Amino acid sequence: MDNLDLHTPMMRQYLALKAENPDILLFYRMGDFYELFYDDAKKAAALLDISLTKRGQSAGQPIPMAGVPYHAVEGYLAKLVQLGESVAICEQVGDPATSKGPVERQVVRIVTPGTVSDESLLPERQDNLIATVYQEKDRFGLAVLDITSGRFQISEPEDRASLQAELQRISPVELLYCEDFVDMALLEPFKGLRRRPIWEFELGTAIQLLNRQFHTKDLRGFGVEKAILGLCAAGCLLQYAKDTQRTALPHIQSLTLLQHSEHIQLDAATRRNLELTQNLAGGSENTLASVLDKCVTPMGSRLLKRWMHQPIRQHEKLMVRQNRITALLQQDLVAAIQPYLQQIGDMERILARVALRSARPRDLTRLRTALEQIPYLRDILAQQTSSDLTALLQPIGEFSAQLDLLQRAIIDNPPMLIRDGGVIAEGYNAELDEWRSLSDGATRYLEELEQRERESTGIDTLKIGFNAVHGYYIQISQGQAHKAPMHYVRRQTLKNAERYIIPELKTYEDKVLKAKGAALALEKQLYEQLFDELLPHLGALQLASLTLAELDVLTNLAERAETLNYVAPQFSDDIGVHIQQGRHPVVEQVLNAPFIANPVELHPQRHLLIITGPNMGGKSTYMRQTALITLMAYMGSFVPAESAVIGPIDRIFTRIGASDDLASGRSTFMVEMTEMANILHQATANSLVLIDEIGRGTSTYDGLSLAWACAEWLAKKLRSLTLFATHYFELTVLPEQLAGSANVHLDAIEHNDTIAFMHAVQEGAASKSYGLAVAALAGVPQSVIKLAKQKLAQLEKLSQQNADQRIQDLRQLNQTQGELALMEEDDSKTAVWEMLEKLDPDELSPKQALAYLYQLKKLV
């Protein structure tokens, strides 16, 4: 392959293009096929399940080859993108008629998982994001781009945990990183990793590139000028997007700095355990999104999921959302608005394809339909008394000129592709109408010619036809071919017929084909001009699509509130979560029986609830519903409860269930402890914390000790709003020792060999766990259950003899060792502080400074 002289001119052209795109598949256009060669062919054959063949030779060996037909390429690209592959599309750009040697070819675009915009390649109701991460020592910069909408954000996560949580939130399908990135373990869980050279992250280049993109002199207007690492990441990401699209990106019009303090933070464990958009098995069934998302537009569905994964903390913004939902319900507007929204479709992504000049004819008809709905929606909302609701559509501009353009230019039901012709409407362009008239007149002329030739020859089977190879022809059956006149020139012999050409037909063929070619060329030119006329209004159109998506989300949430009997939560400036008769939004939809609603009372004087009760009794459901109701409130949604008053929340943590992380070599217990450590380091008094069964996977005393210490730390030091479920009944004595803690339990009724779970939360500790009854329900053999009951009786008798002493010992340990440890920690901190206050660095010799460091080390 290195010696190009050994290859044909066409293969030399291929190898030169492949050298420019060495790491991705190259789809090389040859006639009606895209061909792949060498290793690309082998890889594509395996991934796409297509035939692997051979063509010519290289160094004496046949060249592997595989191909896909051009008209079916979108399906193959979709499969490759889903597998995380990138593909360079190489088209014939030269004219075969005038080319000497191989037709000129160019890579016209590069399809990557994070930069696709074609409708067939995208998940309709999910964001498709590409991200870039940059590291400088222990600091990070992150840039995120949705090329299908133009949303471009940067942030600077404060530490590794924050970066990991943010990456898990956005779940990029493609992730670029600098070649000197140190913490690769953070990135390994993500697919589509792309290593980029250091120079692509240079700050000066990034700022210059961004200013060119936004047509600005500096970036102060975006409020991002101080986010240096984020800008470095943004520069690399924007350049990558430009390189892959091979065109301008006019729909990327701004850059926003994501402020983490404005949102409730959710780590990966919390997103997983709360099953927001993905259940624990990896599917989408029985998730919060499956219940809440009945949006009628794909862009509304995507916006709802962004609200779900990034709840906002500002009560003022939340009340605007809530007031709009209330107004929609009070005025009974849902049924009036949703039919118009349904006609709008995915306006957001259509506009992105317009910006990239890749919009297809049917995209433009859908955009036309969307613009037709706006006046109706504006009229409906203008009649309302709610100022919040009437203000919603104010950002939407006037698009009558653009609507008129699309109504005049595009036919009602155009073909899929402009290359098929017949897209531009009659009357839009006089020259096009003339060429079409000449072309369309062929049918009438050919019918007249066919009738005339039948009469002059006396051949009743004579027909005039056309194919792409031979053009127009006169066909006569073999039985009457002997009657063909002398001036008929034979063009093709078939089994049952002969085909001829005559000078008159040939002249007309040249005329018609010229007219068709001219019409198609002009039509393509007019189609491109439509983009030129729409692009100056792109920013206003994008703002309209975002506003309409928000209206879809709010209308959807109003419908959900009415259908599912949700109420508007209240927000308080005081710390606490007060829920009356709360319900789990997902579980209540899948239960065949009525859901048992339960209250939650958490506030500074009652911030730790020790929850006990039987397995399957509802402890996990109770905790999850508390978190989901809180999260829904901070989305701006109504909530499944009789009433809810919720104070400021900065983070939601969950430590619910665990399994081995075999890929990382971590046991269940290690996973559990890692998640617990994250909570103990990150939680604050404004955090909502759910802990379920901490301390499993190790010895009883180890587990009990850890559970006790974690509960005490959360109650004393962090004072987080905590729901702490446990099977360690010894922990039920904690409320006697810890101010702000209380016991609650879920009960069950056992009768003979059956058990009925009550699912109602009651004050106080549970009396027993009903573990054997649950085991029987699970199908454990009765002989095993009987033996277990015997052993249980023996163990209970034995343990009862020293149960009181054991609890007393725990109480004593709590009062002495725990307090002593905290006191020692405080004492050591005080000593270090006092020593540092007395120290004057300017008066120390190097030897004295070293001595001081040793003393400080001892104190720590």
UniProtKB/Swiss-Prot annotation:
Superkingdom of origin organism: Bacteria
UniProt xrefs under Pfam families: MutS_I, MutS_II, MutS_III, MutS_IV, MutS_V
Any one cellular-component term (Gene Ontology): cytosol
SMART domains membership: MUTSac, MUTSd
Protein name: DNA mismatch repair protein MutS
A single GO BP: mismatch repair
Any GO MF annotation of the entry: ATP-dependent DNA damage sensor activity
Function: This protein is involved in the repair of mismatches in DNA. It is possible that it carries out the mismatch recognition step. This protein has a weak ATPase activity.
Keyword set, alphabetical order: ATP-binding, DNA damage, DNA repair, DNA-binding, Nucleotide-binding
UniProt KW Cytoplasm keyword: no
Family designation: Belongs to the DNA mismatch repair MutS family.
PROSITE patterns for the chain: DNA_MISMATCH_REPAIR_2
UniProt organism field: Pasteurella multocida (strain Pm70)
InterPro entries: DNA_mismatch_repair_MutS, DNA_mismatch_repair_MutS-lik_N, DNA_mismatch_repair_MutS/MSH, DNA_mismatch_repair_MutS_C, DNA_mismatch_repair_MutS_clamp, DNA_mismatch_repair_MutS_core, DNA_mismatch_repair_MutS_N, DNA_mismatch_repair_MutS_sf
Binding site for ATP: G613, P614, N615, M616, G617, G618, K619, S620
